Amino acid sequence: MMTSNILSRFLPPNGSPSVYETIRQHDNHSDASDVEERAGMAFEDEHGDRFSDRELEDALADAGRDDSPGPSEPFLPRSPPTKRDEGGFLKAGSRRRKFSRSGRIHAASPRHKFDDSDDDVPPSLLVEGDQDDDDVLRSKLPPPPRSIDPPNVEPPPRPSPRDDRVHWEAARDRLPLHDTNRRAHHASLWSAGYPNLALVDPKEKALWMWANVENLDNFLKEVYTYFLGNGIWSILLNRVLSLLTFAFVVGFSIFLTNCIDYHKVRGSRTLDDILIQKCTKQMSMSATFLLWLLSFFWIGKAFQYLLDIRRLKHMHDFYHYLLGISDAEIQSISWQEVVSRLMTLRDSNPATAGAVSAKHRKFMGSQSKQRMDAHDIANRLMRKENYLIALINKDILDLTLPIPFLRNRQLFSRTLEWNINLCIMDYVFNEQGQVRTLFLKDTHRRALSEGLRRRFMFAGIMNIFVAPFIVVYFMMHYFFRYFNEYKKNPSQIGSRQYTPLAEWKFREFNELWHLFERRVNMSYPFASRYVDQFPKDKMVQFAGFVAFVSGALASVLALASVVDPELFLGFEITHDRTVLFYLGVFGSIWAVAQGLVPEETNVFDPEYALLEVINFTHYFPGHWKGRLHSDDVRKDFAVLYQMKIVIFLEEILSMIFTPFILWFSLPKCSDRLIDFFREFTVHVDGMGYLCSFAVFDFKKGTNVISQGDTGRRDAARQDLRADYFSTKDGKMLASYYGFLDNYGANPRSGHPSTKRQFHPPPTFPTLGSPSAIEMGNFGDRPAAAGLMGQQSTYGAAPRFGPAGMGDHLSPAPSMLLDPHHQPSASGFRSTHRANPYPRYRASRPPPTISDPIEDEDPPAGKGRSAVKSSPGVGSSGGGIGTSDSNLGESWRMNLVGDEVEEEDEGGENVDTLAGGGGVLGLIQQFQKVNQDNRGRTTVGI
C-alpha cells in the first residue's frame, strides 16, 4: 500500500494521458511551415505536404478511369526534360504545395485549367530546388476533363479505412507526390558532383555548409563557442588537458586511498615500504565499481571529442575562409568584429537552406537581408539564458532552504543551476531550441504544472544517487588545485568572488558571457576595497595582536635557525615537532592575520567604493538608496560577494541540500513558472519565441521601457500590473543601455564611444569625487560623471546624434544593427550620456549638500526638453547650474532644461548653434556663465 502511494505521486492518474504524450502529439500535429507554430525556422521541403485520403482516392479513381491518352492529349503541351547544371544540381525550384492546391480546385471545378504558371516565380529569381517538379507531376497525371460530368453519374461509394490505407500505399508507390527523402537526394547530388570531399576546395565546402544551415541557433552557438575557445588548437588542447586532469584526479585519489599502508609510514624510510602490492585486486566492490564507471565515462568523453574534431575543422574553415579570421587572430579580435563579418557574409549570401521555408521563399526572395544582426544574434545565443535572468530578477524561483533554522537563506549553486536547466528549460524548449507552443496556451496549465512538479521530484531522487561521487571528485580536485596556492600565499584563503546567484542578478538581457565577465571582473578591485575598509575595528585590533605574537615567535625561530641551522632545525620544541614545523605554523598565522589588517594610509570611505561597484555591476536595489553606509547594506553585499572557500563549501553542501530544494521549495512555484513562460513570451517573425524583456524596441528607445498602463483609473491596480509586467531594479533599462554601449557605437561614423574604461582604484578618493550625500542619497540612480562625478565638458558631445549625423562613410548610428533595429533620432537623443556611467541617469543634476530636495518626477514636457536641450543632462552630473544670488542663496539651483526653455522664448537655442557640443558649445557655455553668474558657478571639466 505504501509503495502504491509513493508511485502515485510520480505517475499520472488513471485515464488521463501523460503530459509528455500531449506535448509529443502537439509537436507532431504542428504544421511544419506555420510561422507561428514553428517560429519560422522549419523547412517545408523536409516534412512535405499532407494529403488526405479522399484526395488520393480521387486521383487514383481518375487514373483508373482513363489510363490511355485521350484524343486531345497529343495537342497538350509537354513539359521539357529537367535540366541540370554542371555540378549535378537542379537549376531552380518551385513550390510543392501547388499540386495539392490545384488538386482541390480541380476536384471542385472540372473546368479549372491545369496551367497556373502565372503564380510561379520566374526561374531567374529562384535560388535552389527542383524547377520542373510540377511539370513532371503533370506528365504523370491523367489529363483534365474537357466537359462537365453528366449529372446522373453517382459518386463512388466511400471505401473503408482499410481501403484508404491500401489506396495511400498504392498512391505513394505510383505517384511521387512528395519526395520524402529530399535530404538524402541532396546528399547523393553532392556526392555525384564531388566524389571525393578531400579534393574539394575548403572555401567552396565552407560556402556550401553555410548555404545549407538548417538550425541557425545551433550554428551561431557553435560560432560563439569557437570564438570563446580561441580556435581549434586551443579547444583541442583544452579538451586533452581536461581529460588528463580527470584521469589524474581519479587515479591519484585511488592511489592515495587504496595503495598506501598508512600504518607503516612512521617507521618506514622508502616508498616501497608503505606501498601495497597489487592494490587494485584488494579494492572493495564499491571502489571497483566506481573506478569502472569513471573509466567508461572517460572513454566516452574521449570518443566524443574525437568525433567532434570534424565539426571543429568545419568551423575552422568557416572562420578562416568565409570570415577571414585565423586562429592567431581570433585570440585578439573582438566579438563585435565577428558580428560585423557575419553580417557581411549574410549580405553576400542572402539565403540559407534551413532558415527560409519553401512557402516563404517567394516573400524572402525580395528581401536582401535576414534577421541576423547583433540584436538577433544575441537573442538566438541567449534564448534560454534570458528567461533564467528574468526568473531570478522577478523572484519566481523559490530557492529557500526547507530547513527550520535556515528558511530565510537562499541557496543557488552550480549544481542547482544544472538541475534547473534540466527540469525547466529542457521541459519548456524542444529539440530545435524553440519554446513549445503548448506552454503558450492556458488550456494545459494544470497538466504542465503537474508534469513540472514530477520532474523536480525525479531530479531530486537522481541527485541522491549521483551526489556522493560528485562530492568526492570535487573535493579532491579542489584540494589538488588550491592547496599549493594557499601554502605559498596563506592570505589568499580570504580572497572573495561573486556567488553564482550574484552573477545571475548582475547579468543583463542579451549580454553574452564574455562581455558580462569583462564588466564584472572590472568591479573586483572596488568590491575588495569596499569589504576591506568597512568598519571592523574589533576584528582589526584582534588580528593585529595575533599578527604581533605570531610574528615575534616566527622571527625568533628564524633567527635561531640562521645562527646554527644544522643543530636548530632538527631541534624538537614538542614531541616529534621540530623548529621547522612551528616556523611554518607561525608564519601562516602571521600571514592570515596580517591580511586582515588594512593599510594605515587607507582613507575610510565605503560609500565611494560601493558606488564604484554599482557602476560596474549595475545592481542597485531600491532599499539601498540613502543607506550605503549602513551595516544592512554591507550584509546584503557580503551575501553576494563571499570568500572562495565559503563558496566551495556551499557547492559541496548544495549537493546534499539540492534534493530538498527540488522536493519542497521549487514545486511550490511550478504554477508561477508555467504562467511566466506564457505571459512573458513574444513571437518575432524569423526569430521564433523570445523572452519579452530581451526584445528591445530601438525605435521608441527608453520610452517603451517605462511599462505600465497609465490610462487606468485605479492607481493601485495600475501599480500592481506595472510591477508584474516590468523588471525589478531597472534591469531592462540597464540592459538596453548596456547593449547600446557594446554594439551601438559606429567606429566608422565618427561617434565617440562612452563605454566605461577600467582604471585601477586609487588609494583614496580624489578631491574631485562627489560626496556620499551627493551621489548615494539623492537620485534614482548613482550619479557619476567625468572623473568621479562632475560631468566633464570635454568630450561632452552626445554620443549619438540624429540619424545621418555620422560621417560620409556610414550614416547609420550602428554598423551592427539592421535598419529595422536602428534607433530613431529620439531614441538616440534619449541615450545621450557623456559620462563614463552611461546606464543610470538621474532626473536632475546632483544637488549640493545643503539642498534637501526630495525625489520627484518632472513633467513629461520638461523632462523631454531637458534631455534634448543639452548633452550634459544625464545621469548625474554636474551640468551647468545658475544661482539666483551671488551671496547667500548660492545653494539654489535651476535645471538646465528650465533655463533653456526660458531662452527659447526670447532667443536662439544654444544647442542648435553649438550642435550639441564641441568648441562652439564650450565657448557659448563659458560666455553664459560669465555674463549671468559672474563666474561663480563652475563648469565641470
Swiss-Prot record:
Entry keyword Calcium: no
Feature: compositional bias, Basic residues: 93-104
Membrane-topology descriptor: Multi-pass membrane protein
Compositional bias ranges of the Pro residues kind: 71-80, 141-159
Domain of life: Eukaryota
InterPro entries: Autophagy-rel_prot_9
Chain ranges on the Lumenal side, renumbered to this chain: 261-286, 563-577
Subcellular location field: Preautophagosomal structure membrane; Cytoplasmic vesicle membrane; Golgi apparatus membrane; Endoplasmic reticulum membrane
Annotated PANTHER family: APG9 AUTOPHAGY 9, AUTOPHAGY-RELATED PROTEIN 9
Record's protein name: Autophagy-related protein 9
Organism expressing this protein natively: Aspergillus niger (strain ATCC MYA-4892 / CBS 513.88 / FGSC A1513)
Gene designation: atg9
